[in-house]
Amino acid sequence: MSDVELFALEYTQGYYFKKEKKWYSLAFIKRENAWTQYKPKIEDAKTAFYAIYDAASKEEDLLLRCSMYKKSLESGQIFLQRLEYGRILNSEKEAEYKEDRKVISGIPALIEKEKSSCTVFIEIQGDYERIVQSALTEVFKNSGFRVVRSENEAAYTCNAYIELNISGAEPLAIKPGIEIRIDNNHKQTIFTNQINSTEKTLAYSLEKAQKKAFPLFSETISEELKTEFADRF
């Protein structure tokens, strides 16, 4: 059995098979008719895709452009799904969309190209032995962005502020949280996130608490940002 949903079915006149006491009819598809009926669905998906894709190509901010290309790729997948069904109905007519397929297949390379121009300077407050700084640097690099050493070189500044959220004494407890904001050179905020440690860390000195908490906290930051960057950019 096929799981393909049949479209624009037509049927022959039914006939009665006396021996089985059943009616039978043959189902068939006229490809031209089926294509004519299904084509508007393809065109709707095409229009939706190019609305996002064209807007992305006109966006001046690099990160926003990456994000919009990512959205256009998601829309493009819907377009491709409808084309695949259209190919079943009429492969010759579907072949007329080959240039659109090329446009969609080229989007990942476009995104990577834009990312390589997204230079990022990381400015962080409240870190311990640069543990979170290193984690943020790795996330940006692994996501395709380029981290630079000075703000003058950067197209974007990643401002990060860590709050320890100290409570108690002897032992004291900390439960770090971080606020992250990415601004472009025009002071426009492009990305924000707030990440909190999943548990408190107890110790008899602040330094020992930080030493224990920050490696685990940096892993939490890395995992969440890696996922969010992959989804958005």
Regions from the PLM with identified roles:
Residues K18, S167-P171:
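Short, solvent-exposed beta-strand/turn "edge" segments of beta-rich domains on protein surfaces
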Residues N184-F229:
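Short secondary-structure boundary motifs at beta->alpha junctions and helix caps
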Residues E151-Y156, I182-T189:
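A short, structured loop/turn motif at beta-sheet edges
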Residues A173-N184:
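A short beta-strand signature
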Residues I42, Q125-Q133, A173, A203-F214, ...:
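Solvent-exposed, acidic/flexible segments
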Residues D3-Y11, V120, V147-G168:
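A short, hydrophobic beta-strand-centered structural micro-motif
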Residues Y16-K19, W23-E138, A230-F233:
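A structural "domain/chain start" motif
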